[in-house]
Amino acid sequence: MTDLIQRPRRLRKSPALRAMFEETTLSLNDLVLPIFVEEEIDDYKAVEAMPGVMRIPEKHLAREIERIANAGIRSVMTFGISHHTDETGSDAWREDGLVARMSRICKQTVPEMIVMSDTCFCEYTSHGHCGVLCEHGVDNDATLENLGKQAVVAAAAGADFIAPSAAMDGQVQAIRQALDAAGFKDTAIMSYSTKFASSFYGPFREAAGSALKGDRKSYQMNPMNRREAIRESLLDEAQGADCLMVKPAGAYLDIVRELRERTELPIGAYQVSGEYAMIKFAALAGAIDEEKVVLESLGSIKRAGADLIFSYFALDLAEKKILR
């Protein structure tokens, strides 16, 4: 076999060569850190299903945002754990409610931090669903009105992005119209545009304190559907989304790849709680090298076409200076 013309190994034979020809690179600019903030508590609460993740007491949020910024993280996604739930999740659109307070604290503490406000109701409703319940399930159009109100409150508090995750038909259009009518024409929308009804969300329910009984299959997407997944994102683009998202990320890289070929908008991909937990528990068992697997998994998401990755590993990677 001495007559080989093509020898790809020539470009892999040293670390310098491998670095020179590396096609996909990761940096902290690629990452958004999701954070959980609980009101009316004094102490941090560990999320047992997500080793290393804590619920942050609201009273310590300013300190945590400073820590996050000092580590080099430039963006966070805020999730609130409310102690004031009701049938509609009305605390989420109160001007002095938890949604508003989280954005206000983050922006007042670190003005340059890009704050994305998760816009949903599952942490604010007594039933744990993502909107207003009616006899047939979640009332889509009644929920749209409330999403608009929540979005305006978050924007007024300083949120840079409204991030609707309720999976309601028409939510991007309703939010865009509400923001524009209230004078927030420059507040952007990061839409959870392709959000699957995934079993990988399991640990998140503990982290966010969800009261859900049942499932969300009537409004979140069937994991088996590829064409519908692309359609959902393209609908949100047509309604005025500034960025699109695929959630979860790891098991849906085919969707990220195809969406990248169908849109010019930035794409986010959410490495969800179950993906995080699998890596963490496998590493704790000594089955894998955590750092190497984290970087490989994040690299695969970016390689598939994601511009931003939402990951619970972001702060650890930043503080250990694994990424810069």
From Swiss-Prot:
Regulation of this protein's activity per its record: Allosteric enzyme. Stimulated by magnesium ions.
InterPro entries registered for this protein in UniProt: ALAD (IPR001731), ALAD_AS (IPR030656), Aldolase_TIM (IPR013785)
Cofactor: Zn(2+)
PROSITE patterns per record: D_ALA_DEHYDRATASE (PS00169)
One GO CC term on file: cytosol
Binding-site positions, 5-aminolevulinate 1: 205, 216
Active site (record annotation): 195 (schiff-base intermediate with substrate), 247 (schiff-base intermediate with substrate)
Pfam families hit by this protein: ALAD (PF00490)
Binding site for Zn(2+): 120, 122, 130
Alphabetized UniProt keyword annotations: Allosteric enzyme, Heme biosynthesis, Lyase, Magnesium, Metal-binding, Porphyrin biosynthesis, Zinc
Binding site residues for Mg(2+): 232
Binding site residues for 5-aminolevulinate 2: 273, 312
Keyword tRNA-binding part of the UniProt annotation: no
Annotated EC: 4.2.1.24
Biological pathway: Porphyrin-containing compound metabolism; protoporphyrin-IX biosynthesis; coproporphyrinogen-III from 5-aminolevulinate: step 1/4
Co-factor binding details: Binds 1 zinc ion per monomer.
Any one GO MF annotation of this record: magnesium ion binding
Catalysed reactions, as listed in the record: 2 5-aminolevulinate = porphobilinogen + 2 H2O + H(+)
pH dependence: Optimum pH is 8.5.
PANTHER family linked to this entry: DELTA-AMINOLEVULINIC ACID DEHYDRATASE
Functional summary from the UniProt entry: Catalyzes an early step in the biosynthesis of tetrapyrroles. Binds two molecules of 5-aminolevulinate per subunit, each at a distinct site, and catalyzes their condensation to form porphobilinogen.
Family to which the UniProt record says this protein belongs: Belongs to the ALAD family.
Name the record gives this protein: Delta-aminolevulinic acid dehydratase
Species the sequence originates in: Escherichia coli (strain K12)
Gene name tied to this protein: hemB
